[in-house]
């Protein structure tokens, strides 16, 4: 009977989810559609600020990065939305000059924004804090600027191997370039710092829409769906065997016991639900195979800007997306994830997940834990955020109202989960 109830609930939810999410997320979640529509009509030129405007930042405690790049190359980055050509540049941080670097735009939809997200590429002989690349995300559509930073902090607090993230100031050719979100790149250094040294790392790509751990036909199919970030000279055989075992198993508990770091995966699922990360089902995550230590697979979060509500059409008031979103009966706007579907099909695992979700809801995803973090971030970024809004006009609006919106989301998401978790327990 519990499984029947579970299935019935799922079927009832399907139409609600599809209708609701069509309001929340448009075809912009699908890169092919995004390119067809030719985003957006915004003026790519930033507003030049008078030199004295930067005096308000004299006491800023934010890390300051400086980028020097030929003006024609900077213009190319700002106007060529989907070009991936990196341009020569020089980068300075903490008083240290990194010569021979390259810079380009990064991201998918965000490439269409006037204020581009940036990827800084370093010489392998002169890495930046151990990394060969640096991600500086735009935050142009986030009224609070800090959703990504907070999302990575929540994942880490829940016991997930997640990137470090912080707010930084960027000077470009001697002038204020903007307030950016620095996100640590998952790479060899990232893995070593999290006891995953030597792991094989795959990035779930948005190119194919199939990076949802489904079983694919051949090596070329996996190449299209996933990008290998470490051990690049090796084949995709390990990933193929994992997805094959997932598709063919008749014993879900045995599969997860053999292949997956189960506690970390439960932590990942719980954090994903807490922050309402709906954009990870078939992209925006990494898979790491820890061959040297546990012999298990780990899921690592990525691209968390569309959490705590969604900036696509500014639906930050939506805090009640379903707990089981991303499964076959309750798909998200981009589809459903095969690993999550298999996990939630097993009653024992569902109970373990709900237990952990309840625990984290009361221990980590609380106003007592998160509001002070938001207050500190708000104080630190306020002067730079004000200048950024002038330099890069857009839809995001007032920072302080944006921070209040994140706080409101947290309260409403907590209230929803406190109501919904008991309902899900009864259905099992």
Write out the residue ranges for each language-model feature.
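Phosphate/dinucleotide-binding and metal-coordinating scaffold of catalytic cores
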Residues: 1-428
